[in-house]
């Protein structure tokens, strides 16, 4: 079974989230979860410490099964 990585950036301050982002299809749950963890770290670095602290930003991800794959 394949899994699609879905990521989202949210603000704990406002309670709002940006639209979900497709992080690609992965062959196993492990691959999807590992990619989600790494992509979360990369997204936080890209957002920057100042913006993350100011807006109380955080990144979430989930791995959804790909139907019919």
Where do the language-model regions lie?
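Short, well-ordered alpha-helical segments
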Residues: 28-31, 35-40
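A short, exposed loop/beta-hairpin motif centered on an aromatic-Gly-Thr core
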Residues: 17-31
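Hydrophobic alpha-helical targeting segments used for export or membrane insertion
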Residues: 2-14
């Amino acid at each position: 079974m394949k899994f699609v990585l879905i990521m989202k950036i949210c603000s704990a301050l406002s309670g709002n989230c940006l639209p979900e982002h497709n992080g690609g299809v992965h062959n196993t749950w492990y691959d999807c979860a590992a990619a989600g963890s790494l992509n979360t770290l990369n997204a936080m670095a890209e957002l920057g410490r100042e913006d993350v602290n100011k807006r109380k930003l955080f990144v979430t991800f989930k791995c959804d099964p790909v139907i019919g794959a």
